Amino acid sequence: MIYHKNINMLVPYYLMYSYAYYQENESLIEDAEYDQICQDLITNWNNITHWHKPLLSLESLKAGTGYDIKYPPRVVGAAIALIKESQLKTT
């Protein structure tokens, strides 16, 4: 995935995967990968400069959840597109 090459991309993927799971009941990745994204965000927290970083909380990351995030329309649209792309691959 792109976030393996650029730590700032952890933020949008965490947000999209969280939205898909908690709002749309769509699990796009394995739980272990989601947990690893959370851990990578915590580990790299001080070096991440993504503009959506303020939407994240270390408390939620440590708990391995994205349940209480206020998702902006941009994230919602991207997550919906990711869900549709995933569904096309499985059909």
Q: Where are the model-predicted features located?
A:
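Phosphate/adenylate-binding "loop-and-lid" substructures adjacent to NTP/NAD/dNTP-binding pockets
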Residues: 1-91
